[in-house]
Amino acid sequence: GFNNTINVWQLHVKGFGSWHLSPKTFVNLYAYGGIKLPFKQPYFNQRFLGYGDVFMQGYEYYVVDGVAGGFLKATLAREMLNFNIRIPPRKGKEAERIPVRIFGKIYGNSGYVHNPQPGENNLSNRMLNAAGIGIDILTLYDVTFRFEYSFNQLGQNGLYLHRKTIF
């Protein structure tokens, strides 16, 4: 809102593209950018990277506060398995099935967050890079389980587990 204590204009833009290289192989690009004006914002309004769905793989355990920035995620994925799990029929009903698709992937991320008052956060005002490999399991209602092993420029690596649904 606008009053004497808080004055902020925000613009956040995101885009996604997917291109098939073969029937089971594709490239995904996801870009995100944002800016908050004026740059001098109270700490509460400086939340940027690491909150909710706005994060970079390999930096899941970090938050980077700032007023402007963005990132690009690139993924090369291939469908490895596609099968159905059969559920026994119930009384008066036909047998049902749960579709399962498993994808192998490699990915890379690059991003930057500008913070005019970085304080103790040494991840602001520098390029952040990470890469890794992973497996995505896609099932009913676009429920996705992601198992990702990431490496970041801080010399850290680890296995990260994610779950995403449309609900």
Predicted features and spans:
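Outer-membrane beta-barrel transmembrane domain signature
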Residues: T75-I85, P89-K91, A95-G132
